[in-house]
Amino acid sequence: MKNISIYLLALVSSLACFNEVTAQQVPVRSNYLMTSFQDNVASAGNKPCLDMRMGFRNQWIGFEGAPSNSFASLSGRIFETNQSVHGVGGRIEIDEAGPWGTTSFSLAYAYKLKMTNGGWLSSGLSVGFVQHRLRISSLDFPDVQAAYDPAVSASKQLMFPTIDAGLWYEGEHSFIGISMINATASELSEMTLSTRTSRHIVATAGTSIDLERSFRFRPSAQMRMVSGLPISLDVTALVSYDNQISIGVGYRSQTALIAHLQLALMDYITVGYAYDFGISDIRLAAASSHEVTIALSACDKRSKRAQHCSAYD
């Protein structure tokens, strides 16, 4: 009975930690212009060639148990005509925050239809699974002996199906997309006393404005919505030169100022780096976050076939 009481206390403590990171059940990404497929399955096959993305985010440097995220994705086309495209892809993602962790894998399909104005409208769906982990051994126990009891210190793991859906529209210079992530909203009562994961709505939009001498201005925004929490908004302004280098700044609502740098290495690789300067109260313990994203594309960027919306990537 004593062990059960301590176990429940550990769960209550972990639930408090879980509530602190609820807003990040869907990871926040500063380089969202480079991770459209990760955030919206309808963008699978946007490029007419194999496209691989990898990324890592280390948040709140110096804060014990701070969130970290890594992902990899591969997408492409399986069939296309002048009026329609069938895109497919796969995604894997690992997210850690204190004693909590998730690993997700999904396969996606997107259908794209060319509109009369020359733009493309896409709808997409992904199906996969997500594994939730609770490492009880990493929690602090009031009873030292109980911490070494296998019945108390063992980790908990649960696996659930997950479904994402999205819509995406892009023209030559602008795009807009909206997606629902974690439509299944799994119940975690076996781990955390009647806690349910949340459905997330992610909306992203951007445009591109040509300037003089091969310069281009690319403003964009991403909004993340989840029931019971304030809306999170990122606003980004990038200036690109000759599709080779981009620098810019961003703002995340009441949370961070962001510095951006993107470099095209050769014609097939793009590397993006973002540095978040914390402006919320947590900056007193951890003021910064780092994020690196790598894009590997089989398309030669200077090929006409590779051209797509200039507002992202």
Placement of each model-derived feature along the sequence:
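Bacterial N-terminal signal peptides
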Residues: 7-16
